[in-house]
Design a protein with these regions (language model features):
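Short, low-complexity, intrinsically disordered N-terminal peptides in bacterial proteins
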Residues: 1-5, 183, 188-192, 272-276
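Short, charged beta-turn/beta-strand-edge "cap" motif at the junction between a beta-strand
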Residues: 45-49, 94-99, 247
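FNR/FR-type flavoprotein reductase catalytic core
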Residues: 76-184, 191-230
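Ferredoxin-reductase
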Residues: 2-86
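Structural signal for conserved beta-strand scaffold positions within catalytic alpha/beta enzyme cores
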Residues: 12, 59, 159-161, 225, ...
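Local cysteine-cluster metal-coordination motifs and their immediate loop/turn environment
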Residues: 119, 203-204, 227-259
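Short Fe-S-cluster ligation motifs
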Residues: 255-276
């Protein structure tokens, strides 16, 4: 369900990890409507910006009407957002798109590379609230860029850093065999057996995750990914976020995603469309 919203009011601004900003805004209708993994189109007033910018919500609290956004400063739009503070208003459109499918009872493995972690605090909270066993795999270049494990209460957290300053030294994808080894293996193709995997991160990480999962016998149907594609309108009009699906045809990230099961995507034809 998408909403044309009156402005949200910024309540807090913080830096949860190096290079990232977290804005907490107040908008009760949006907080109540949001499903984990959905996104908003935020209007920015930076110079030379015309289109709204898509940002996945990190979490929402319907009781207090609060929504959190975690993002890196990479351009004019995010730079403008990064200097908003308490009392500023933000023009939001959303929530938009499809969030993660959190139904079921399988154990869940979260694979978050870099700022891909931004979508997962609310996802993990919802999974834990459903009684599902959750293991969070966090990866970053260095320890200062890791979201604190305390943001995932009720889940086991494992970390990997490129420089070895926290946890395993190497890619977060390298933690997959350890995490998967704690559960019965998947039962062939489809979605039977084994844990379910939820992932978001840079393109190389997603590609490595899919290859590692294939070698470990994990069907693509057990993997859900949150896609980061170039997006214009966010409502299915501009077709700028199309990604190829198996066979003929395309999915639109803004309508069919951003959260999609990996077996619905033709990765050989769409790898260049993603950026993280």
């Amino acid at each position: 369900m998408s909403l044309a919203l009156k402005p949200a009011v910024v309540l807090e601004r913080s830096t949860p990890m190096s290079g990232a900003v977290e804005l907490v805004v107040h908008h009760p209708p949006a907080a109540a409507a949001l499903r984990p993994g959905q996104f908003f189109q935020l209007a920015v007033a930076a110079p030379q910006t015309i289109l709204r910018r898509p940002y996945s919500a990190a979490w929402a609290d319907p009781d207090s009407g609060r929504i959190g956004f975690i993002f890196n400063v990479v351009g004019a739009g995010s730079g403008w957002l990064a200097v908003r503070h308490e009392g500023h208003e933000l023009d939001l459109l959303g929530p938009l798109g499809r969030g993660f499918d959190l139904d079921g009872s399988k154990p869940a493995i979260i694979v978050a590379g870099g700022l891909g972690v931004a979508v997962f605090p609310g996802v993990v909270g919802a999974l834990v609230a459903r009684g599902r066993q959750v293991t969070v795999l966090l990866g970053a270049r260095t320890s200062a860029q890791l979201l604190p494990s305390g943001r995932f209460p009720g889940a086991e957290v494992m970390t990997a850093t490129d420089d070895g300053t926290a946890g395993y030294q190497g890619s977060v994808v390298d933690l997959m065999p350890v995490a998967l080894g704690r559960f019965p293996p998947p039962q062939g193709e489809g979605r039977g057996g084994g844990p379910e995997i939820f992932a978001c991160g840079p393109t190389p990480m997603l590609q490595a995750l899919l290859e590692k999962s294939r070698r470990l016998g994990v069907p693509l149907g057990l993997i859900q990914v949150s896609l980061e594609t170039p997006m214009g309108c966010g409502v299915g009009t501009c077709l700028g976020c199309a990604i190829a699906r198996p066979g003929d045809g395309y999915l639109l990230t803004c309508l069919d995603g951003p959260c999609v099961r990996a077996d619905r995507i033709d990765w050989s034809r769409t790898a260049d469309a993603f950026h993280g």
